[in-house]
């Protein structure tokens, strides 16, 4: 087995030939490479599958033996400094490697069809393979220098993929925003690494932790300086994992292709920050203030992300804020010292969120057949609805991911989120109340997404009926330019919806006002098939995606169903003590500051109590979302109750004002972007204008003033002479005599 560990260094580099070969092929044989572009997906998937098999093999050995392996090559630069490069294989490395490869394979299979008509197909697969290579290099790194190198490569790949359609201004701006925001965190990370090396003299994790603890125990170092270094290290994770207040890049990152959104949110970019904190947790534990800061940032992000997701119209942005909130749960767990719960939620959330993003990609793909390539419309949930009958397989997969993220048993996220909620009660009741309340908000906004997308009828052709703004429908190319294909929308659907047969014949002859009929379902079919409508408009409807897009969703659905078993509290299956808690054995020895000496009976009691409470909150959130967003005509039996509630609710202006405040808060992203735009961007522009004024008016003014002064002096002097040489000689002699006399009387 040790022979296998010796060759583990190859794990990050197995997928590296793909971007190299694509680049060489486009450089030397561009025509042939482009003609055979669909063949490049197979080696990409094959090589990543080899990495997955390798990682699974190592993980099985980790579970059975808890063996930790580190190999280091030392490069001595001089007598005082040597650079060590190597790889580190432990349970955290294996967990992340399996997560990256399994999600990455599903995304690559999905992307083969999703990106098949895109001009940048080859570029996309080159970026994706480089992305997987960078992330695998990050998780196998044995020291902080390697971490930082691969950290920057992960960031670079994410910027390239966020701005993949770089000719679209929104995509280019999103790429710049992600770059600038992460520069803040990455600069802090670099300073923290240098500060730790200056203090401990080592970059290696094992040596670093031991030296760090010895310095603190013996009071041989400035504790304030160590705290500052730890804060700077944590700043890198805050930016990369979209934690408050450096979260602003994450929603805009949805401008990239949907498959890369799934990979970024599940297993790569945002997971890198959680991995860094988990890797450095022994260091952070030695500084209690940092642990409290991590927990505080986590709980703020949990609540902040959930509230911002409440009123989003874009399906991908809604899921992005959901990711932000769930990452906050992981950071909260790490801050509480619940290492296993954080990694467990990282695993379950990765598969659930990958399923949701691939499902949203299937929805967007189907909507593009109706509205064309227009992200403002194909991703707008207001224009969706009624997709259940058009994309039933996608609907079932999306529902499974939604229920999992809501925390409904026995799906994956229920087990991990409930463990975090249980630990939060032991850490701080205030944090626990916020975390549990946010669990209800999560159920609310996730079912809001589901109901707006799949329930009711397609709102695209019902905009007059549903009160939506009547926007012109146009298509734009894959490169962001408006096309000339216009879908005419002159058909007054609301009026036609409520006509009887006699009124239809005179529809074009006179203008009539018609009463509203709430039973829309009966009126929908004639609108599509009745021969009485003499209109030139052709209405298209979404359709289910192809099998190559549905297969990854099916596999991720299986993960969402069963992956929660590896960390469930069912430690014994029967009298023979079959242990199902694989994660507990996998992460041995595990860090848990809240359960150092707890018994199974106490754990069971806490689990049942908190599980009942959290599931109740989740179902309450689902009920509220169903009450407000489930179409009236699909639940007519509750119509009288709902009408009476709405009437009594609208009379209370206080509640109406609160709802408006919450909506504005969510729709305007918590005003954080506005604050940054005014304070940072506006402040920098004011500083630039002041600098420009100082440079042009003061610096250039002084220089120009000297030149102008010389000009006027020269103009004045030129009129002193009369143009006669004898006068000049006489004047020169007079000045010379005066000069000699002055020198004589002064020095002699």
Swiss-Prot record:
Changing residue 175 to G: In strain: cv. Borszczagowski. It catalyses: a plastoquinone + NADH + (n+1) H(+)(in) = a plastoquinol + NAD(+) + n H(+)(out); a plastoquinone + NADPH + (n+1) H(+)(in) = a plastoquinol + NADP(+) + n H(+)(out). One of its GO terms (biological process) is ATP synthesis coupled electron transport. InterPro entries: NADH_UbQ_OxRdtase_chlpt_su5_C, NADHpl_OxRdtase_5_subgr, ND/Mrp_TM, NU5C-like, Proton_antipo_N. Keywords: Chloroplast, Membrane, NAD, NADP, Plastid, Plastoquinone, Quinone, Thylakoid, Translocase, Transmembrane, Transmembrane helix, Transport. Changing residue 748 to C: In strain: cv. Borszczagowski. The keyword GTP-binding does not apply. This is NAD(P)H-quinone oxidoreductase subunit 5, chloroplastic. Belongs to the complex I subunit 5 family. The keyword Cytoplasm does not apply. NDH shuttles electrons from NAD(P)H:plastoquinone, via FMN and iron-sulfur (Fe-S) centers, to quinones in the photosynthetic chain and possibly in a chloroplast respiratory chain. The immediate electron acceptor for the enzyme in this species is believed to be plastoquinone. Couples the redox reaction to proton translocation, and thus conserves the redox energy in a proton gradient. NDH is composed of at least 16 different subunits, 5 of which are encoded in the nucleus. One of its GO terms (molecular function) is NADH dehydrogenase (ubiquinone) activity. The chain crosses the membrane at residues 9-29, 40-60, 89-109, 125-145, 147-167, 185-205, 219-239, 258-278, 280-300, 327-347, 354-374, 396-416, 425-445, 550-570, 611-631, 728-748. It holds the Pfam family Proton_antipo_N. It is a multi-pass membrane protein. GO terms for cellular component: chloroplast thylakoid membrane. Its EC number is 7.1.1.-. It is found in: Plastid, Chloroplast thylakoid membrane. It comes from Cucumis sativus (Cucumber). Changing residue 170 to S: In strain: cv. Borszczagowski. Its main location: plastid. It is an enzyme of class 7 (translocase). It comes from the Eukaryota.
């Amino acid at each position: 087995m040790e022979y296998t560990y010796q060759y583990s260094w190859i794990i990050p580099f197995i997928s590296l030939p793909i971007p190299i070969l694509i680049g060489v092929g486009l450089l030397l044989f561009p025509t042939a490479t482009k003609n055979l572009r669909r063949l490049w997906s197979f080696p990409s998937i094959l090589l990543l599958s080899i990495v997955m098999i390798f990682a699974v093999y190592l993980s099985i050995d980790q579970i059975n033996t808890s063996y930790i392996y580190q190999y280091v090559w030392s490069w001595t630069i001089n007598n005082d400094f040597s650079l060590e490069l190597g790889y580190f294989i432990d349970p955290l490395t294996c967990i992340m490697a399996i997560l990256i490869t399994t999600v990455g394979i599903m995304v690559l299979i999905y992307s083969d069809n999703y990106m098949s008509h895109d001009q940048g197909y080859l570029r996309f697969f080159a970026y994706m393979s480089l992305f997987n290579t960078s992330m695998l290099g990050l998780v196998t790194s044995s020291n902080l220098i390697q971490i930082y190198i691969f950290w920057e490569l992960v960031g670079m790949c994410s910027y390239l993929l966020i701005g993949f359609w770089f000719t679209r201004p929104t995509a280019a701006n999103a790429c710049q925003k992600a770059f600038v925001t992460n520069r803040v965190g990455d600069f802090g990370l670099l300073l923290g690494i240098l500060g730790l090396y200056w203090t401990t003299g080592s970059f290696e994790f094992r040596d670093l932790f031991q030296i760090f603890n010895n310095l603190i125990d013996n009071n041989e170092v400035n504790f304030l300086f160590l705290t500052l270094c730890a804060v700077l290290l944590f700043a890198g994770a805050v930016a990369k994992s979209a934690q408050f207040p450096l979260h602003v890049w994450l929603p805009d990152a949805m401008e990239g292709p949907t498959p890369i959104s799934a990979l970024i949110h599940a297993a790569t970019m945002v997971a890198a920050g959680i991995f860094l904190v988990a890797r450095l947790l022994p260091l952070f534990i030695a500084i209690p203030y940092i642990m409290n800061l991590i927990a505080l940032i986590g709980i703020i992000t949990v609540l902040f992300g959930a509230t911002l997701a409440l009123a989003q119209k874009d399906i991908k942005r809604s899921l992005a804020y959901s990711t932000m909130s769930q990452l906050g749960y992981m950071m909260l767990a790490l801050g509480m010292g619940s290492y296993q719960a954080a990694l467990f939620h990282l695993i379950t959330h990765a598969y659930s969120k990958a399923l949701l993003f691939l499902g949203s990609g299937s929805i967007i793909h189907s909507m593009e057949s109706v509205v064309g390539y227009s992200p403002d419309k194909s991703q707008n949930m207001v224009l969706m609805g009624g997709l259940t009958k058009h994309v039933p397989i996608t609907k079932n997969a999306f529902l499974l991911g939604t229920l999992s993220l809501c925390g409904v048993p026995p799906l994956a996220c229920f087990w991990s989120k409930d463990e975090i909620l249980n630990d939060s009660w032991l850490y701080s009741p205030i944090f626990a109340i916020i975390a549990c309340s946010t669990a209800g908000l999560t159920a609310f906004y996730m079912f809001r997404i589901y109901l707006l997308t799949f329930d009711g009828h397609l709102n695209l052709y019902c905009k007059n009926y549903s009160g939506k703004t009547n926007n012109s429908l146009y298509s734009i190319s894959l490169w962001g330019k408006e096309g000339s294909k216009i879908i005419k929308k002159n058909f007054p659907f609301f009026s036609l919806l409520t006509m009887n047969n006699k009124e239809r014949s005179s529809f074009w002859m006179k203008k009539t006002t018609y009463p509203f009929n709430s039973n829309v379902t009966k009126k929908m079919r004639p609108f599509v098939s009745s021969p009485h409508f003499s209109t030139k408009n052709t209405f298209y409807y979404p359709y289910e995606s192809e099998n190559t897009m549905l297969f990854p969703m099916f596999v991720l659905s299986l993960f969402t169903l069963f992956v929660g078993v590896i960390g469930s509290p069912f430690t014994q299956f029967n009298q023979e003590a079959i242990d199902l808690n694989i994660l507990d054995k996998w992460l041995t020895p595990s860090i848990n500051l809240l359960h150092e000496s707890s018994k199974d009976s106490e754990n069971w009691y806490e689990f049942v109590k908190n599980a009942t409470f959290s599931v109740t909150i989740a179902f309450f959130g689902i009920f509220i979302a169903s009450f407000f967003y489930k179409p009236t005509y699909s639940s007519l039996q509750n119509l009288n109750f709902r009408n009476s509630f709405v009437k009594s609710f609208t009379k209370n202006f206080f509640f109406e004002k609160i709802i408006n405040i919450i909506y504005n808060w969510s729709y305007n992203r918590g005003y954080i972007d506005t604050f940054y735009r005014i304070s940072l961007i506006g402040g920098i522009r004011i500083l630039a204008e002041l600098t420009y004024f100082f440079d042009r008016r003061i610096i250039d003014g002084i220089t120009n003033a000297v030149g102008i002064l010389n000009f006027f002096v020269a103009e004045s002097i030129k009129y002193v002479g009369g143009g006669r040489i004898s006068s000049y000689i006489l004047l020169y002699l007079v000045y010379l005599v005066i000069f000699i006399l002055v020198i004589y009387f002064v020095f002699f």
